[in-house]
């Protein structure tokens, strides 16, 4: 998207790679759960809810595009996450 700064794109890529533990180019529910545990305690229901919100095509994985779309819509949250990762 035209309003993304190159540094935002680089930050999204960096965070995505941290979440994508096995490096397959997509974030599974398990990987999301593990990453969210780093941020604090998280329940399986919270992970399911987050997956449902971010995984817009419903394939069970978060693609980089889906992650970027979520990051654009939640800039403040992503900035906070970037400080931790």
Swiss-Prot record:
The keyword Ion transport does not apply. The keyword Secreted does not apply. Residues 7-42, 45-77 form the EF-hand domain. GO terms for molecular function: calcium ion binding. Ca(2+) 1 binds at residues 20, 22, 24, 26, 31. PANTHER family: EF-HAND CALCIUM-BINDING DOMAIN CONTAINING PROTEIN (PTHR10891). This is Polcalcin Aln g 4.
């Amino acid at each position: 998207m035209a309003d993304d700064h190159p540094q935002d794109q680089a930050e999204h890529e960096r965070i995505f790679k941290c979440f994508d533990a096995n490096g397959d180019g997509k974030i599974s529910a398990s990987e999301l759960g593990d990453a969210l545990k780093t941020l604090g305690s998280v329940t399986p229901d919270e992970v399911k809810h987050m997956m449902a919100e971010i995984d817009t095509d419903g394939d069970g994985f978060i693609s980089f595009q889906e992650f970027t779309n979520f990051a654009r819509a939640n800039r403040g949250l992503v900035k906070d996450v970037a400080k931790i990762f």
